[in-house]
Amino acid sequence: MKLLLSLAFVLALSQVKADKPVWADEAANGEHQDAWKHLQKLVEENYDLIKATYKNDPVWGNDFTCVGTAAQNLNEDEKNVEAWFMFMNNADTVYQHTFEKATPDKMYGYNKENAITYQTEDGQVLTDVLAFSDDNCYVIYALGPDGSGAGYELWATDYTDVPASCLEKFNEYAAGLPVRDVYTSDCLPE
């Protein structure tokens, strides 16, 4: 198990160049990394977490599954939204939820906001970097509570029809990492 984790860690680091992932290039990729535009769209559309390269999260718990998100209360003046997440984990097979204040942020020396900082109801502060976004989907580079990379997430509005653009980017960025399905048909109520 330690060998597998060490290998995954080394492979994840191979994606990083001088503490900066290969996709963290504002000139080349900034058009698809606009965090404020993404948060505004989140108010209009619900998204499901389709795939992830990690399985434990400080908010969603261990072995999280069936994660979905939406947002409300768009505040243009303060530039934030109230994000709502629903999920299950190995501690409870009943849907749980959390509300978090989501604010656009800047990472990797960007001039434009390319990350989202979440403040949970219990005061945790977590940051996700928007590695890629397109119509109806996005790829997140989730940072752990200590700021180190936790892994990649693939989100889409329809888990049965993930746009090729996001699937290709996710597969490129997550190459060599263990990938698991998070939102599947098992998540739907019977």
UniProtKB/Swiss-Prot annotation:
UniProt subcellular location: Secreted
Annotated keywords: Disulfide bond, Pharmaceutical, Secreted, Signal
GO molecular function: amine binding
Binding-site positions, histamine 2: 118, 155
Assembly information from the UniProt record: Monomer.
Family (UniProt): Belongs to the calycin superfamily. Histamine-binding salivary protein family.
Protein name: Female-specific histamine-binding protein 1
Organism listed in the record: Rhipicephalus appendiculatus (Brown ear tick)
